[in-house]
Regions:
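Mid-length scaffold segments of soluble, non-membrane domains
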Residues: 65-109
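Surface-exposed, low-hydrophobicity interaction/linker segments
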Residues: 7-75
Length: 164
């Protein structure tokens, strides 16, 4: 593992050597914002990325699970700080929502480390998978790709590592 990988992932990635190699190629690293402190519940935060991958956030994270209603960025950033993975989706087709839910339900790590939510700040048909300081996007649902991302990144990033 190279020093850049260690810095990007906050330590040695888990899993097989193949997963460690794959984790360096998933998406792109995003610089951690300088301030990552708590702000009062309800206070809006201006993030440099949509969806955000770090920054100031509310003091209470979301429970793990699949949501069909909006979760504010300020809430899910706390999940990211805990090493959770946040899957943001923008689907107008209900079959795509069902396909994503089914794919995530098949990933054992999603129950303890994942939050999925609708998000209208990405293109229609897109999925954005965020971990602390890391962002991966894809068009549509790829169950195999989602499973690899969870295996490579769940519980790895974030200054605090707690399951939901």
């Amino acid at each position: 593992t190279s020093p850049a990988t260690i810095e990007t992932f906050g330590g040695t990635p888990p899993g097989t050597p193949e997963i460690r190699v794959i984790s360096t190629a998933i998406g792109q690293p995003v610089p951690i914002l300088q301030s990552v402190s708590h702000v009062p519940e309800g206070q809006k935060v201006g993030y440099s990325d949509a969806p955000p991958t770090s920054g100031e956030h509310w003091s209470r994270p979301a429970s793990c699970g699949f949501y069909t209603e909006n979760l504010p960025d300020e809430r899910i950033v706390h999940n990211l700080e805990h090493g959770n993975i946040v899957v943001s989706y923008n689907f107008t087709n209900p079959a795509q929502v069902t396909g994503l839910r089914d794919a995530l339900e098949d990933i054992e790590l999603f129950d303890d480390w994942g939050v999925a939510r609708p998000y209208d700040r990405i293109a229609d048909g897109q999925v954005a998978i965020a971990a602390w300081g890391h962002l991966h996007t894809m068009n549509g649902v790829s169950p195999g790709e989602l499973a690899l991302i969870f295996e490579a990144l769940a519980g790895v990033n974030g200054p605090e590592r707690f399951t939901c």
